[in-house]
C-alpha cells in the first residue's frame, strides 16, 4: 500500500514531517474478492494540518485452471461405468458434460455407457466470487460395439426328406438385453 502527499509549500517535502502517516486496510492475504477501504492516519507536522483521503483496495478473482483430467479413451458397450478424474487449481469441484448422452451419460464422476459410438466429455469449472472460470478441457471417447455371436444349431435329415427348420441362438447380449433390441 502506498500514499503520496499534496500541498507542501516553500519547496518543502516529507522530510519536514515530525511523524509520517500510517496506511492500512482491513484486507489480508486470505481476504476474499471484494473491495476493502484503505485508510491513512496519524501524520504530524508543526506547520501543516493533514486532510486524509482514503482509497479502496480491490481484491479481484484469482485465476484457476484444470490441471488434471483423466478418463479412458476407449470402452466397449456393456463395460462398467468409466471413472473421470479432474482437479481445479482452486480446489473447486470440476463438472462434466457429454456431447452425446445416448453414448455416454455423465453421472457425477462416472460415465455410464449407454450405447456404441463416440462422445466428447467436457470438464469445466465455472468459478465463484473468488475464482474466475477455468478454461474448459475435453476428451473424445469411443465406445465400441459389444461382440454378439449367432450360433447355428446342428441339425440332420434323411435323404430326400425336407430340410428341417434351422435354428440358432445368440450369445453375448449385455445389460440384460435380448433379441428384442435387434433392428
Task: List PLM regions with ranges.
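Solvent-exposed beta-strand/loop surfaces, strongest in extracytoplasmic domains of secreted
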Residues: 1-183
Amino acid at each position: 500500500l502506498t500514499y503520496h502527499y499534496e500541498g507542501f509549500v516553500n519547496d518543502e517535502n516529507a522530510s519536514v514531517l515530525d511523524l509520517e502517516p500510517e496506511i492500512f486496510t482491513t484486507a489480508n492475504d486470505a481476504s476474499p474478492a471484494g473491495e476493502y477501504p484503505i485508510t491513512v492516519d496519524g501524520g504530524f507536522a508543526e506547520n501543516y494540518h493533514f486532510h486524509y483521503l482514503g482509497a479502496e483496495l480491490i481484491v479481484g478473482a484469482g485465476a484457476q485452471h484444470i490441471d488434471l483430467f483423466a478418463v479412458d479413451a476407449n470402452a466397449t458397450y456393456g463395460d462398467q461405468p468409466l471413472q473421470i478424474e479432474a482437479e481445479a487449481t482452486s480446489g473447486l469441484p470440476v463438472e462434466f458434460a457429454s456431447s452425446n448422452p445416448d453414448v455416454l451419460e455423465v453421472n457425477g464422476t462416472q460415465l455410464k455407457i449407454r450405447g456404441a459410438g463416440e462422445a466428447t466429455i467436457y470438464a469445466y469449472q465455472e468459478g465463484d466470487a473468488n475464482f474466475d472460470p477455468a478454461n474448459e478441457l475435453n476428451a473424445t471417447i469411443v465406445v465400441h460395439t459389444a461382440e454378439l455371436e449367432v450360433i447355428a444349431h446342428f441339425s440332420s435329415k434323411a435323404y430326400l426328406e425336407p430340410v428341417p427348420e434351422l435354428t440358432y441362438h445368440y450369445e453375448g447380449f449385455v445389460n440384460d438385453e435380448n433379441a428384442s433390441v435387434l433392428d
